[in-house]
């Protein structure tokens, strides 16, 4: 349940994402979208295929530079140009979760290495034991047991794969 007096965790105001196809033609993929998400709140972005849902997500996490609008995350304006350090910090706090988990999970890697990849990139551990401990804690957060770290993606049910993707 979201707190009534809390500031929004994510605030999107007047988001526009246009793609120039040619000199005379521009696709308005997202045009003037605004919403707020509060701590503890679950938010569903629903629309038909091609309506811009994924484009909104990619703009928010800065895979695309928005054409216009303001995006505030945890009280910080992330709309304009971000430094490399700001981008790295943002990437540790936001992620895309794909609808088809098998498309986003490397079938040749164990779950420990799939989850550990983010820890490796951001240098979030000092020893292999600390890495393993962090992976197990992340698995616990999504309702999976420590022994799941030794499995490959094909050894999970669809729901479990989705949780690995979230982890």
Language-model segments: residues:
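ABC transporter nucleotide-binding domains
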Residues: 1-167
């Amino acid at each position: 349940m979201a707190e009534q007096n809390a500031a929004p965790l994510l605030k999107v105001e007047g988001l526009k994402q246009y793609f120039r196809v040619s000199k005379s033609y521009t696709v308005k993929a997202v045009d003037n979208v605004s919403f707020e998400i509060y701590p503890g709140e679950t938010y569903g972005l629903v629309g038909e295929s091609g309506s811009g849902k994924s484009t909104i997500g990619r703009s928010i996490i800065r895979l695309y530079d928005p054409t216009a609008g303001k995006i505030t995350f945890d009280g910080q304006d992330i709309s304009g140009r971000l430094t490399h350090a700001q981008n790295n910090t943002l990437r540790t706090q936001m992620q895309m979760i794909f609808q088809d988990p098998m498309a986003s999970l490397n079938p040749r890697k164990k779950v420990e290495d799939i989850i550990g990849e983010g820890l490796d990139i951001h240098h979030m551990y000092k020893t292999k034991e600390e890495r393993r401990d962090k992976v197990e804690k992340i698995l616990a957060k999504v309702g999976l047991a420590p022994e799941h770290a030794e499995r490959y993606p094909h050894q999970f049910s669809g729901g479990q794969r989705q949780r690995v993707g979230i982890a």
